[in-house]
Amino acid sequence: GMICRHPIYLERTVRMIGSDIANTSKGTGVVHIAPAHGMDDFGIGQKHNLSTESSVNSDGEFMANIAPNLEGKFIFTSGNEAVVEMLKEEMNLFHEHDYKHSYPYDWRTKQPIFVHTSNQWFVDTAMLANKAEAAISGITTYPDNGISSMLNRLQLRSYWCISRQRAWGLPIPVFYHKESGELLLNESTIQHLVSLVLKHGADIWWEGTELLPTQYNADEYERGRDILDIWFDSGVSWDCVLRDSKNRTTQADFYIEGKDQYGGWFQSSLLTSVGLQGVAPYKNLMVHGFVLDEKGQKMSKSIGNVVDPMVLTNGGKNPQRDPAYGADALRWWVAESNVHQDVHISTTIIKSAAESVQKIRNSVRFMLGNLNEFDKMKIVPTPAMLILDLRYRFEDKKLWYVTSMNYPLNLSV
């Protein structure tokens, strides 16, 4: 293929690779590849055996392996400025200007995200896909279109990263040799840790000092700092919950969750169960929609569109703005909602529900008013109602003949 010269390190050459992630309808049609810093780039790198060595550390700073003069510079500020200066020095910067473009941001901090590779633990879901598909072929979902959605998500998921770097969580019980980096994880070390956790709790992993069995030299190893993905935690809940009196796992009659769990709890439970016992952990899936705001947006504290049910039922600090509609109005709104679809909620919607409840109350009051002093002992028995009905018809017909002066020879009912 085509070979290009590096714009900064002129002695280096770069191989051109064709891919559909770049096209001529947007930009120049040519983009750089950073296999260690992007999902698409990583996929292309794997396909073409490109290096995935990272050039940015976990603090967002350039590392020495990319260029000594860039080491320690933050990529979004001084690092960018240094790269621009290096391009200028080599006379390879044709134009520079600021412009707006799409870029991923963290939804919590609202700060830009930079992706980089790191060593993680994975489950090869491709090896479980066929077994998982076979296991859910007999599963019933409510609504009935859920299986296809779940199958689509399974087919798109080739690997499942089950490790996370957090300050809390269930640790992955692996040890690393301090010199060689070789990992230590076997039945002996697991059983030893199980006994420690049963005695001291899960925090023993972070606080304990004698975590290895006596046949190992603990001074040569260090504990891992990774924790399990919370979806792996919840995904094996069936192993604790669904055990019978003989300690055998069984299938749950129902798993009930939101529609987003086709790629979450439903899937993680399926994969772990199929991998460990060869069957799905459930017989049926019940899927519900979500409660959205009046405009159909997901409610979020950061956006400020959360509807407080306590304010709707009991009223807010300002009764004129937030009157109390009562619990029955909220119950009515729930009762008339479709469980499988997203539903909207707002003050206006609950006000309408309260009006519906008031109409029902008025109707009930009317009926109760008509039943005032009602005595069930005075109710005419059902068999006697026929005689009364015949008598009424006779009297009605007789009255008509009398008023019309038209008597028949034989008057009967």
Swiss-Prot record:
- Compartment annotation: Mitochondrion matrix
Keywords for this protein: Aminoacyl-tRNA synthetase, ATP-binding, Ligase, Mitochondrion, Nucleotide-binding, Protein biosynthesis
Q: Describe the reaction catalysed, as an equation.
A: tRNA(Ile) + L-isoleucine + ATP = L-isoleucyl-tRNA(Ile) + AMP + diphosphate
Biological process terms in GO annotation:
isoleucyl-tRNA aminoacylation; mitochondrial translation
Which ranges belong to the motif 'KMSKS' region?
298-302
Q: Which residues bind ATP?
A: 301
Against InterPro entries, the record matches this protein to: aa-tRNA-synth_Ia, Ile-tRNA-ligase, Ile-tRNA_ligase, Rossmann-like_a/b/a_fold, Val/Leu/Ile-tRNA-synth_edit
Q: What is its EC number?
A: 6.1.1.5
Known PANTHER family for this protein? ISOLEUCINE--TRNA LIGASE, MITOCHONDRIAL, SOLEUCYL-TRNA SYNTHETASE
Q: Which family does it belong to?
A: Belongs to the class-I aminoacyl-tRNA synthetase family.
Specify the protein name: Probable isoleucine--tRNA ligase, mitochondrial
Originating species: Ciona intestinalis (Transparent sea squirt)
